[in-house]
Regions:
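A structural signal for multi-pass alpha-helical bundles of membrane permease subunits
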Residues: 6, 32-305
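Short, Lys/Arg-rich, polar N-terminal cytosolic tail immediately upstream
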Residues: 1-26
Length: 305
């Protein structure tokens, strides 16, 4: 009797295993389907404004003001881009071109100065032991607790006394004041994640402390430096409040201020605002795509320690 039932039990066991495997595969399919659907929904929400910005930059004004809204414009034109870069000699085009140059100079200079000062300060905080080290780091980071509008008046009075109003140097000084603490915070954590023994070995071979920093530590900290530089560049590139208050001429105006001035007294040029937004977003996007693999690793290593 037992021998006769064995094939039947074996078939039932095989069928049960197949059924369990089928249920597991269906659960995995449902799980990954949900993950992909959620990722698609989030990506759509994130990318939709930028897609609409691109459409608005090439759409005819009649399409932008049409009711109901036309998601696909009937007339496509790149005249706004050509007016800015090719043949445009209007005040709007001149202002935007000057603002583009100003933003590149101010953001780049602010990042270079902040990295130089912040890396040295972060290395000292991570490697040296001196009184007030932690207190100084906390005080520098506490500047982020104040809203920007709260320190506008002191900064404005300082700029007046130093004769730096409406100058690129003035904005560079202001931007360094909040990029440097960010650099100090990220890089101090990154330096602590690098083994001290590597620097000790370099110093045994004859390197000074500064030489060990330049030849050993900085090459290992390159991902953190790139991540910090990118975020510092974004802070300076997108800043609006200080640039609006401390500048008044095309000699020092940045892109956010120039885009805001596309709004006239009696009319709003939505197409030019969209064109300016697209052009302003290209440099940060390009930098982010090129160095994206360093950004996550750099920030995570700097935040863990």
């Amino acid at each position: 009797m037992r021998v006769a039932l064995s094939p039947f039990r074996a078939q039932r066991s095989l069928a049960a295993r197949r059924e369990r495997g089928g249920r597991a595969r269906r659960r995995r399919a449902l799980y990954w389907g949900f993950i992909y659907a959620a990722a698609t929904a989030v990506a759509s929400v994130v990318l939709a404004p930028f897609v609409w910005l691109l459409i608005s930059s090439v759409a005819d004004p009649r399409d932008l003001l049409a009711r109901p809204l036309r998601w696909i414009p009937e007339h496509v034109s790149f005249a706004r881009y050509s007016s800015i870069f090719v043949g445009g000699m209007s005040d709007t085009a001149d202002t935007f071109r000057a603002a583009l140059v100003n933003s590149a100079i101010i953001a780049g200079s602010s990042v270079l100065i902040s990295l130089t000062v912040g890396i040295l300060g972060a290395y000292a905080t991570a490697r040296l032991r001196f009184p007030g080290r932690r207190v100084g780091l906390v005080l520098m980071l506490s500047t982020y607790m104040l809203p920007p509008i709260a320190i506008v008046v002191p900064l404005y009075l300082t700029m007046v006394q130093l004769h730096l109003l409406d100058t690129r140097i003035g904005l560079i000084v202001v931007y360094c004041s909040f990029i440097t603490p960010f650099t100090l915070w990220i890089m101090s954590g990154y330096f602590r994640s690098i083994p001290r023994e590597l620097e000790d070995a370099a110093r045994v071979d004859g390197c000074s402390r500064l030489g060990a920093l330049v030849r050993v530590t900085l090459p290992l900290a390159w991902p953190g430096i790139l991540a910090t530089a990118l975020f510092g560049f974004l802070l300076a590139w997108d800043e609006f409040l200080y640039a609006l208050i401390f500048t008044s001429s095309t000699h020092a105006k940045t892109i956010p201020v120039a885009i805001a001035e596309f709004t006239g007294r009696f009319a709003v040029d939505f197409g030019m605002i969209a064109t300016g937004g697209v052009l302003a977003s290209i440099p940060p996007l390009f930098i982010a795509f090129v160095f994206q693999r360093y950004i996550v690793g750099g920030l995570s290593a700097g935040a863990i320690k």
